[in-house]
From Swiss-Prot:
This is Protein translocase subunit SecA. One of its GO terms (cellular component) is plasma membrane. PANTHER family: CHLOROPLAST PROTEIN-TRANSPORTING ATPASE, SECA INNER MEMBRANE COMPONENT OF SEC PROTEIN SECRETION SYSTEM. It is a peripheral membrane protein. InterPro entries: Helicase_ATP-bd, Helicase_C-like, P-loop_NTPase, SEC_C_motif, SecA, SecA_DEAD, SecA_motor_DEAD, SecA_preprotein_X-link_dom.
Length: 906
């Protein structure tokens, strides 16, 4: 009996089919306008932009303008590049405009498709950000698609790694801005460390289209963007800890490959304790005493560095530095560093220069950065497998865009061998057969090491005409990948290296023109050469088609089906024939970790001989099931991490909004008065609690605290002896005295200098306390997981305690700002040369490090501008103290060290 759901789908169509039907109706509207727009001359077509903008100001919406705007871009693309967007590209453009993810097969024209919603949303004048995974793609797309936008009267900018602040500001001011996800995130963080609004470069987060959206919002979701400053140098300590690890044996630790964790056994712990004791670094009797928390952390990092991180797979050593390799793309990520001492442990392991650890100055995850956009959309060739995550976390629906022509690629069943040696013999055999008939081949590997091992095998077998593309040679990446479709081409690539560059059968015409004619000037000769290249590519394509089309060979399955699908999707573009096959062995990581024993037993029962493979759809399904389990686990990890990051994100928003308010304000007196009043109220409530008898009042402590904070000698003890005096009266007298002192100080300076000083103190204090708060949150996050053993929810504990820490930070902020403003003397007016410049931290990728002093530039300048006037010291007047050493006795006469007395607030 047919189920009711099946019957309903047959009668009404699925939700996907209904959505496509609605989009096709819009496509029909756009197509109906085509003839009308073809009749417009270039000037009339360009004037459509001004017309649309005028209609928007008169109340029309971008949704209503969509058919005409898309028709305009389609006609412009035809005139500029002789490329007419297909109907399926119009569908994809509408999905992007409606804040969805367009899953579009490789070679179907995502870059051109994106111009449709980019143009439409840029008409609002609020800026459109097009996000790519690297500088090369950002520059390429800005240059090529920018010609279409320029034809229509829109401006296009591109953010590259080495741009200065002025160039970035200009690029963000354009109608359309192309940039990498890293540059966007770091610019946002730097903007929120600026001293003045004029130093900021971004102008808001209106609409973003994320190319390769799965790579950025899924693969990179757990990686925070961090701007950091160096801490003290501990090179000797890292080297010492590193010497302990080689003497450990497998019985000293346990590795969980599924969870990618490593822990010491009891035997290993005892061994490490003895080593530390001999080296004089063990505090107390046990490694797990509270005093040894930091040492445990460093030892665990050293163990991870040696046993979990593999050279040429997870990182490479280049120019005496550790360079991380992206596990998903195989690309190097220069400048990115592991945090919390792990990178230093790797440097000690490889005996390269150890860079100091860094303190986080500001951070944000891609998850929270991209959720700031009012409108967010994305495009990729593979997103369906992660549809649930896109929906739950980003509220983005994945829509599979139909191909313009039917897919003719043949995806063959996996071949599974007992050992890796047998598998590689079969791969070489298969490569030889396909290579001899001139079929273009792409071989995908999972690491640099494996790509180079395969290359060496091929050389020994007499196959030498091939290109290796991995993190070592990423500079040639785009060109190598672009020509991988030439007949007889054999390319070995790590994972998805070259992603974003189209592999066309016969080769990439545009890439060849750029490469071969880069020095040839415009003219008849160049035009003739271009025609010659086009003719040659056409002939080469026919040869490649005759050889069977593009052949993708995978040497291993990835944990994620999506990465496998990306590799497969390289073949069969735009209706071309092709095939794909995965070669596996029971020694592969995925097979070994997830149930190879069971499969090994099954293969033995089948009597599988050496060099024989088993091929069956059932095995493909079993592997897919294992991959789904891994994907589900990784999704849960990312979702859980986001819950914790959301807590910090809420606090980050408060701090950044407060900073923005301070930067934009011309006069901060009202904010400062509010802070001061809250500090006084807190003081009085602490020492003279409301609704208590005067006998319970600690007026002496209150009097000392007032002197400590405000540099005021007030007779609070005398006031408290007056008959019938209430706490409200004491509060009022303190407030009046502080106000009087403030007014006297304010009269000494011009309003401009005072306002500048107020801003400097507020921003410097906020930034300092926020940095300390981030460290506290990291520490809390690292220990809160253990609360689960006490039947307490770690997330709720984290929320509660992080809120308490945040409240304490805000109280501390009010106290420190109030005290500083009551104690400092301004003796030098700021000059033009001292006006702060934008801080550029462009030296790195995901961990942006400041050079030298870890304070922003304006904070360093401030030390030259705001100083204490040295006179003979009067214990009751801190303005006479001059510079006091941190460990000197405090001049106030308390006999305490300065850093524990008045110096605590200076």
């Amino acid at each position: 009996m047919v189920g009711l759901g099946v019957f309903a789908r047959k009668f009404f169509g699925s939700a996907y089919e209904r959505r496509l039907k609605a989009l096709r109706q819009k496509v029909a509207q756009i197509n109906a306008l085509e003839e009308q727009f073809q009749k417009l001359n270039d000037t009339q077509l360009c004037q459509k932009t001004d017309e649309f903008r005028k209609r928007l100001t008169e109340g029309e919406t971008v949704d209503l303008l969509l058919p005409e705007a898309f028709a305009t871009v389609r006609e412009a693309a035809k005139r500029v590049y002789d490329m007419r967007p297909f109907d399926v590209q119009l569908i994809g453009g509408m999905v992007l405009h409606n804040c969805g993810i367009a899953e579009m097969r490789t070679g179907e024209g995502k870059t051109l498709m994106a111009t449709l919603p980019i143009y439409l949303n840029a008409l609002e004048g609020k800026g459109v950000h097009v996000v790519t995974v690297n500088d090369y793609l950002a520059r390429r797309d800005a240059e090529t698609m920018g010609k279409i936008f320029s034809f229509l009267g829109l401006t296009t900018g591109v953010i590259l790694h080495d741009l200065d602040s002025d160039a970035r500001r200009s690029a963000y001011a354009c109608d359309i801005t192309y940039a990498t996800n890293n540059e966007l995130g770091f610019d946002y963080l730097r903007d929120n460390m600026a001293f003045d609004r004029s130093q900021m470069v971004q102008r808001g987060h209106h609409y973003a289209i994320v190319d390769e959206v799965d790579s950025i919002l899924i693969d990179e979701a757990r990686t925070p963007l961090i701007i950091s400053g160096p801490l003290e140098d501990r090179t000797d300590f890292y080297n010492l800890i590193d010497t302990f690890i080689p003497s450990l044996t497998p019985e000293d630790y346990e590795i969980d490959e599924k969870q990618k964790t490593i822990t010491f056994t009891e035997v290993g712990t005892e061994k490490i304790e003895k080593m530390l004791e001999q080296a004089g670094h063990l505090k107390g009797k046990s490694l797990y005493d509270i005093e040894n928390v930091a040492i445990i952390h460093h030892i665990n990092n050293a163990l991870k560095a040696h046993k979990l991180f593999v050279r040429d797979k997870d990182y490479i050593v280049r120019n005496n530095e550790i360079v991380i390799i992206d596990e998903f793309t195989g690309r190097m990520m220069p400048g990115r560093r592991y945090s919390e001492g792990l990178h230093q442990a790797l440097e000690a392991k490889e005996h390269v220069a150890i860079q100091p650890e860094n303190q986080t100055l500001a951070s944000i995850t891609f998850q929270n950065y991209f959720r700031m956009y009012r409108k967010l959309s994305g495009m990729t060739g593979t997103a369906t497998t992660e549809a649930e995550e896109f929906s739950n976390i980003y509220d983005l629906e994945v829509v599979e865009i139909p191909t313009n022509l039917p897919i003719q690629r043949r995806d063959e069943d996996d071949e599974i061998y007992r050992t890796a040696e047998e598998k590689y013999r079969a791969i070489v055999r298969d490569i030889r057969q396909a290579h001899e008939k001139g079929q273009p081949i792409l071989v995908g590997t999972t690491s640099i090491e494996k790509s180079e091992q395969l290359a060496e095998r091929l050389r020994k077998e007499g196959i030498t005409d091939f290109r290796v593309l991995n993190a070592r040679y990423h500079e040639q990446e785009a060109y190598i990948i672009a020509q991988a479709g030439v007949p007889g081409a054999l390319t070995i690539a790590t994972n998805m290296a070259g992603r974003g560059t189209d592999i066309q059968l016969g080769g990439n015409v545009e890439m060849r023109i750029r490469q071969e004619l880069q020095d040839m000037p415009e003219g008849i000769e160049r035009t003739a050469k271009i025609e010659e290249i086009k003719k040659d590519v056409k002939q080469l394509k026919e040869k490649a088609l005759a050889a069977g089309g593009f052949y993708v060979i995978a040497t291993e399955r990835h944990e994620s089906r999506r990465i496998d699908n990306q590799l497969r999707g390289r073949s069969g573009r735009q209706g071309d024939p092709g095939r794909s096959k995965f070669f596996l062995s029971l020694q592969d990581d995925l097979m070994r970790i997830f149930g190879s024993n069971r499969m090994d037993g099954m293969l033995q029962k089948l009597g599988l001989k050496e060099n024989e493979a088993i091929t069956h759809p059932w095995i493909n399904k079993a592997l897919e099931k294992a991959q789904k389990k891994v994907e589900a686990r990784n999704f849960e990890i990312r979702k859980n991490l986001l819950k914790y990051d959301d807590v910090m994100n809420d606090q980050r928003k408060v701090i950044f909004e407060q900073r923005m308010e301070i930067m934009n304000a011309d006069d901060l007196i009202e904010m400062i008065l509010e802070m001061r009043n809250e500090v006084i109220e807190d003081l009085v409530e602490t020492y003279i609690p409301s609704e208590t008898y005067s006998e319970k009042w600690d007026v002496k402590a209150l009097q000392e605290e007032i002197h400590h904070l405000f540099n005021l000698e007030l007779p609070v003890e005398e006031w408290a002896k007056e008959d019938g005096i209430a706490e409200e009266q004491i509060l009022e007298r303190i407030s009046n005295a502080v106000t009087k002192l403030e007014n006297e100080r304010a009269e000494r300076y011009s309003p401009e200098i005072l306002a500048y000083f107020h801003k400097a103190v507020l921003l410097e204090t906020i930034d300092t306390l926020w940095r300390e708060h981030l460290v506290n949150l990291d520490h809390l996050r690292s220990v809160v997981g253990f609360r689960g053993y006490a039947q307490r929810d770690p997330l709720n504990e984290y929320k509660t305690e992080s809120f308490e820490l945040f409240q304490a930070m805000l109280r501390n902020l009010r106290r420190i700002v109030t005290s500083k403003l009551m104690r400092f003397e301004i003796i030098q007016q700021p000059t033009e040369s001292l006006i702060p410049e934008q801080v550029d931290g462009n030296d790195s990728a995901l961990n942006d490090q400041r050079k030298g002093n870890d304070s922003p530039l304006w904070m360093q300048i401030q030390e030259n501008r705001v100083v204490v006037n040295p006179k003979d010291r009067n214990p009751k007047d801190s303005t006479t103290w001059g510079k006091v050493g941190r460990n000197e006795r405090c001049p106030c006469g308390s006999e305490k060290k300065y850093k524990h007395c008045h110096g605590a607030f200076v």
